[in-house]
Regions:
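C-terminal interaction surface of TIR/SEFIR-family domains
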Residues: 1-34, 49, 55-73, 83-89, ...
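Redox-cofactor binding/interface segments in oxidoreductases and associated redox assembly factors
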Residues: 79
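WD40-repeat beta-propeller superdomains and closely related acidic/aromatic-rich repeat-like regions
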Residues: 224-239
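Low-complexity, Pro/Thr/Ser/Gly/Ala-rich linker/spacer regions in secreted
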Residues: 218-224
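Residue-level signal for threonine
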Residues: 43, 82, 88, 230
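Conserved C-terminal RecA-like helicase domain
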Residues: 35-48
Length: 239
């Protein structure tokens, strides 16, 4: 099995909206805590490295060598699909280059804007299948398909960010080799354990504070003169 340098390569159009979504997804992926059971089944303790080119490069005949190398050394290609990306010559070249050494199953589509049939690259919307013709011979035919995508469409950046937080599990499930439902359940369990740990810590502090307050009150009862000694001195009888 090939050892990859990057867990994923994020391909996107370098306009403000697409770049924002790519950056948000990048952060979530690299900071995601993989539940222990998923770690055991996937063999991954965390998402180590995600490649995201931050600069728009000039159009040339060939992709830059570092981009080609990063694509070849990435296990998955995360494609941010939008009207801008489908028009981007760079994005289309990145998809074509990736598919030279990877399968279509390793391309993870993210629907940022527009309708799937208008923003997904055509190469991802068809697959070749063997079919038998009327005369009994076998032939290869193209069948239209719609790739499964994480839908992060939103009316503004705030809504898009929220959608990314929700839909990132669909992408992570593919990267970790498990189902979305399994990862979502493990994620909920992990979140619940964290919440219980926090509540346990708060409860512990509350108990300590209560004991301390109780001890202080007992000291007051036993030695009231320690609280305001000046008051008791004022009322000492004079003989």
């Amino acid at each position: 099995m090939k050892k990859y340098t990057y867990d994923a390569f994020i391909s996107y159009s370098h306009n403000e909206k697409d770049a924002f979504a790519a950056e948000q997804l990048h952060k979530i992926l690299e900071h995601y805590h993989i539940p222990k059971r998923i770690q055991q089944s996937s063999g991954k303790k965390k998402i180590e490295r995600v490649f995201r080119d931050r600069e728009e490069m000039p159009i040339s005949f060939n992709l830059a060598s570092n981009i080609q190398e990063a694509l070849d050394q990435s296990e998955f290609l995360i494609l941010m699909c939008s009207p801008n990306s489908i028009k981007s010559e760079w994005v289309q070249r990145e998809v074509e280059t990736f598919l030279k050494s990877h399968s279509k199953e390793q391309v993870l589509t993210v629907l940022l804007e527009g309708e799937p049939e208008k923003v997904f690259p055509e190469v991802l919307c068809y697959e070749e299948r063997k079919a038998e013709s009327e005369d009994g011979t076998e032939q290869t035919v193209k069948v239209r398909i719609e790739p499964m995508a994480a839908d992060i469409r939103g009316k503004d950046k705030s809504e898009i960010k929220k959608k990314i937080e929700q839909e990132s599990l669909r992408i992570l499930a593919k990267m970790l080799g498990c189902t979305y439902d399994t990862l979502r359940q493990r994620h909920r369990e992990y979140a619940l354990h964290r919440m219980m740990a926090v509540l346990g810590g708060v409860a512990g502090v509350a108990v300590v504070f209560t004991i301390y307050a109780f001890q202080r009150s007992m000291n007051v009862i036993r030695n009231p003169e320690e609280i305001r000694p000046d008051i008791f001195h004022r009322f000492q009888p004079i003989f």
